[in-house]
Amino acid sequence: MTKSNSSDSKKARAMLALTRFVVYLILIFLSALCLFSFYMLIVNASRTNADLQSGFKLLPQGSFMANLKNAWNDSSINIPRGLLNSFFVAGCTAVLTTYFSALTAYGIHAYNFKLKNAAFTFIMAVMVIPKQVSATGFVQLCYKYHLTNSYLPLILPGIATPVVFFYMKQYMESVLPMEIVDAARVDGSGEFHTFNRIVLPMLKPALAVQLIFSFVESWNNYFLPALLLDKAEMKTVPIMIAQLRAADYSKF
């Protein structure tokens, strides 16, 4: 019996080691693919337009600094200002989106009211509606209230993000026991104090993930800024990249 148990234990350890090896191998392969994308980004940045049209190459060329200088000194765009604008918009959007989505998820999770399920269903239904569907009305509203060439229409709508709300609610259901919230209420803690001092620290992993995702999504947003921002000093990086694509490629 002892020999049989020892044999089974060795087989289990061998299977565990094999499983870990396969998992690590897959992760290394996926990481290499991601790093290869960044590598090709640098390689293509070091090539001229004629080189890019000639075909695929793995080795960097010698035009990286010239391309960077041409893009940085291009009179039609202001890259430092564009980076600052994008950081401001994306940073504000990420912080506000994550906080208020977590607050909304807490309200749905912690309170029982008649229309709780209806409210959750409505928020989920909004998630399937493409933003392009309501873009015309939204842009007309911005023009009516003179909100063009302003970052408010880019930041405020992003606060109501059903995807982030859904993620935060599901995370709360797995890590936030209501007994902790009830104990805080018994001790006299207000709802906002409970949320900010007790609930949010328990959501740090989810908050970090959603901050990153929201920041990247806002940073890559081209659709609304292209419709609402006309002044050159207010344009974000995606708009400037589009301008570079439409510019004279012989310089790059």
Regions found by a protein language model. Name each.
Residues K11-M15, T19-F252:
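A structural signal for multi-pass alpha-helical bundles of membrane permease subunits
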Residues M1-M15:
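Short, Lys/Arg-rich, polar N-terminal cytosolic tail immediately upstream
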